[in-house]
Amino acid sequence: LLGLPNAGKSSLLSAITNAKPKIGNYPYTTLTPQLGIIRNYNQEIVLADIPGLINDAHKGVGIGTRFLGHIERCKILLHLIDAKSPNPLKNYKNIIKEITKYGKGLEKKKQVLIISKADLVSNEELKVIVKNIEEYSKSSVLVSSSINKIGLNELIDVLFTKLEKLDNENNNKETKEKKWSP
């Protein structure tokens, strides 16, 4: 789970997993990565909630490089964008800038974009936010509210589907790379 401080990452982790992270309405409630597990039939996904990233996190500000290092091992980035923030598109761009400047391929990882706290804005505001981020990112955007349980099942379905597809692609790539020799 990736985003600015107070974007709703811990609330989402708590809403869709068995984790009970500390949740507060102030930045830096999460100080260390928190883990939770989503189970779906015979599959499970481990979600990692990392502390919020701030400007210049890639330089180590707010011990950002330590947090970014944790997501190097993640297969997919769940990018939360707070609907209630003054400029959600700018917030999205800031996080993309930080993971790009950090390097190590983070910007190339698959992402699921989620507008969080959707219950706190009007439908009209939400449509504008979604449109702006979809146009900029060239990706579809999910809408959620952890408190009101909006969009959570869809998010879980998308996450399992994307991970299965990614695992299949990686398995096919590994099979092609292995050469048989008697």
Question: What positions do the PLM features span?
Answer:
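C-terminal-of-GTPase-core extension/linker across diverse P-loop GTPases
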Residues: 1-2, 7, 86-93, 97-182
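Conserved G1/Walker A P-loop phosphate-binding module
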Residues: 1-61, 65-76, 81, 156-157
